[in-house]
Amino acid sequence: MKSYIAKPEEVQRKWYVVDAEGKPLGRVASQVALILRGKNKPTYTPHVDTGDYVVIINAEKVVLTGKKLDQKMLRHHSLYPGGLKEVPYKEALAKKPEFVFEEAVRRMLPKGPLGRKMLKKLKVYRGSEHNNEAQNPEVLELRY
């Protein structure tokens, strides 16, 4: 018996909506990353994008446990000497919670062209309103 290998044109994609209000950032991000990769499907193939679309709402109401809100830093480098930029998560969540969510999920996806393609299926919104109602997204209850 041969192993099944999914073809990109055969993949059936669904839309899911996840409410992040009051849930830990890492737990939501890890489950969303699995859905974006397609690991929740029996047709999962590592080198093919078999994942579904995910809409995250209420990104500004996400929770960071412990002292992470004050102590954890969001870092990036300008590629100039001494160009390390650090912003506390408290400020980053206040200014742009969408970016914080996208970064958390991006770091859990594969690096390279396939991971970038998977990340394009993630839509993050600050409040409870989103403009993807036409796709009839299913409400996804997170496991943990």
UniProtKB/Swiss-Prot annotation:
CDD domains: Ribosomal_L13 (cd00392). One of its GO terms (biological process) is negative regulation of translation. One of its GO terms (cellular component) is cytosolic large ribosomal subunit. The keyword Transmembrane does not apply. GO terms for molecular function: mRNA binding; structural constituent of ribosome. Keywords: Ribonucleoprotein, Ribosomal protein. The keyword Amino-acid biosynthesis does not apply. This protein is one of the early assembly proteins of the 50S ribosomal subunit, although it is not seen to bind rRNA by itself. It is important during the early stages of 50S assembly. Part of the 50S ribosomal subunit. This is Large ribosomal subunit protein uL13. It comes from Clostridium tetani (strain Massachusetts / E88).
